[in-house]
Amino acid sequence: MPQRTTLTPRELDCLHWSALGKTSWETARILGIAARTVDFHLANACAKLGVANRRAAVARAVQCGLLPALTA
């Protein structure tokens, strides 16, 4: 993983909603974009964070301080 990972605001939006358990379809409805676009942003975030899936991307983003940790 690069020392400084920079995610776009939309990638962070998609990761945020994914962290809350939303599907791509649900996130798309919330953000007013297509579900495929959500998948595109999540795939880019995964690549930038050096992980294989959205769960790992959320965990890495929290670890890097890009997303706040969720509490129950």
Protein language model annotation of sequence segments:
Residues 1-37:
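Helix-turn-helix DNA-binding segment
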Residues 3, 29, 47, 62-63:
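Short polybasic/polar patches that bind polyanions
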Residues 12-16, 46, 58:
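Hydrophobic residues on short alpha-helical segments
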Residues 22, 35, 46, 65-66:
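Residue-level detector of secondary-structure transition/capping positions
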Residues 37-39, 51:
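Intrinsically disordered, low-complexity peptide-like regions
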Residues 41-44:
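Residues within the DNA-recognition helix of helix-turn-helix
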Residues 48-72:
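Basic, Lys/Arg-enriched C-terminal extension of HTH/homeodomain DNA-binding domains
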